Swiss-Prot record:
PROSITE patterns: COMPLEX1_20K. The gene is nuoB. Gene3D superfamilies: 3.40.50.12280. GO terms for biological process: aerobic respiration; electron transport coupled proton transport. Binds 1 [4Fe-4S] cluster. GO terms for molecular function: 4 iron, 4 sulfur cluster binding; iron ion binding; NADH dehydrogenase (ubiquinone) activity; NADH:ubiquinone reductase (non-electrogenic) activity; quinone binding. Belongs to the complex I 20 kDa subunit family. InterPro entries: NADH_UbQ_OxRdtase-like_20kDa, NADH_UQ_OxRdtase_20Kd_su. Residues 210-220 have a biased composition (Basic and acidic residues). NDH-1 shuttles electrons from NADH, via FMN and iron-sulfur (Fe-S) centers, to quinones in the respiratory chain. The immediate electron acceptor for the enzyme in this species is believed to be a menaquinone. Couples the redox reaction to proton translocation (for every two electrons transferred, four hydrogen ions are translocated across the cytoplasmic membrane), and thus conserves the redox energy in a proton gradient. This is NADH-quinone oxidoreductase subunit B. It is a peripheral membrane protein.
Length: 220
């Protein structure tokens, strides 16, 4: 439009959306939610070598009401899932989630009844970070990609509609129908499957604590 040529030095032009998103991405406060070994790598990012303070993220919030980003670092059990959802619901908008590591992203090697097969069953995830555990450089790369995503987010009423379309109100659902049977017939079927697996392994019945200790003492 030629307006830039008529402005004096020291004046920049930008729209409100870009300014708001820039302030948001430069002051993202993470919520500490370390559950396993990935949390050690997340702590390393806060050290002087990687210096997450460069991005205004050195303050790991102990309360979800003063946090913008939840970094789920580790596996999430079914008993922990309601707590995770409650912490997420207490975070103010706008809020973002990074699933750090394969355990948080897809359950990892813990494919059983006790572990949620991906935190996206519980909360909406904005960034998936592979690795077991991922290195601190990978976490920094995911944070930079999240910053780029924040810069493109709308700040008007359209943002709420987009968040709903992306699953911002993710319901707390069981991670697997196989390991979380709902009715009696499904529970009976799961018990028969477990009994068949025990027979294949040579154990006719599940061992109790005393029986297991006796088996170990006998050298079996």
């Amino acid at each position: 439009m030629g307006l830039e040529e008529k402005l004096p030095n020291g004046i920049l032009l930008a729209n409100v959306e870009k300014l708001v998103n820039w302030t948001r991405k430069t002051s993202v406060w993470p919520a500490a939610f370390g559950l396993a070994c990935c949390a050690i790598e997340m702590m390393t990012v806060g050290g002087s070598r990687y210096d997450i303070a460069r991005f205004g993220m050195e303050r790991f919030s102990a309360t979800p009401r003063q946090a913008d980003l939840m970094v789920v670092a580790g596996r999430v059990t079914n008993k922990m899932a309601p707590v995770l959802r409650q912490v997420y619901d207490q975070m103010p908008e706008p809020r973002w989630v990074i699933a750090m590591g394969v355990c948080a992203s897809s359950g990892g090697m813990f494919n059983n009844y006790a572990v949620v097969q991906g935190v996206d069953h519980v909360v909406p995830v904005d960034m998936y970070l592979p690795g077991c555990p991922p290195r601190p450089e990978m976490l920094l790369d995911a944070i930079l990609k999240l910053h780029a995503k924040i810069m493109d987010e709308p700040i008007n009423a359209k943002r709420a509609a987009l968040r709903l379309e992306s699953g911002a109100r993710t319901e707390l659902v069981p991670s697997s129908e196989r390991y979380a049977p709902k009715n009696r017939s499904q529970r009976k079927l799961a018990e028969r499957q477990q009994a068949a697996q025990r027979r294949e392994m040579g154990a006719e019945k599940p061992l109790g604590a005393l029986e297991e200790r006796a088996e170990l003492n006998a050298g079996r």
